[in-house]
Amino acid sequence: MMSINNICHIRKNIHKAISIEELMGYEGIISRLYFEGLGKIVPLEFIFTKRSKQPPLDPFNAMLGLGYSMLFNEIMAGVINAGLHPFVGCMHSIKGGHPALVSDLIEEWRAPVIDSLVLNLVKRNMIDVDEDFQYSGEGCYLNGAGRKLFLSAYNKKIKSMNQYMDRGQTFRESIFSQCKAYASTIMNIDLERYTPIEIR
């Protein structure tokens, strides 16, 4: 509850931001609070206290990392299909050959696609913390069996219907629709053409 209250408080300041740096600062704070809150509803055997990557330090982070990578590829396909340049974004900067626009557009899809998928897997005991993961060096990763299970669950999720858009679409179709809406917004200089999804 505290994390949600803090996020709502910080959210009120977002429209007052006068620079991308300030806006990204708010995004970073909210992201940290969000993952703290997420950790409180994760089963104890999948203990998760904060986001870790390169390497992921625990099974929950291992699944988030793999899921976000796959979602990144979905967004990249949508961006290219919409005729957009993946390296020209609004918030994330172009550095080290990173597709900034893809990083911009992925944010609204992380929770409804990947976070919900991973939570579903652990809460329904569909993946085993001891049997489906392996440790290598300092990192934790899905092993062969775990990866196969996760990929199957991901494919079902991305092809499943959702009601985030005005019409029934699969998540993959909705991602492509949002990329096209973004392209239309840029081409017509009309912010009304892009409506971010709201998590339900």
Segments from the language model and where they lie:
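Active-site helix-to-loop segments that bind/position phosphate- or nucleotide-bearing substrates
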Residues: M1-R200
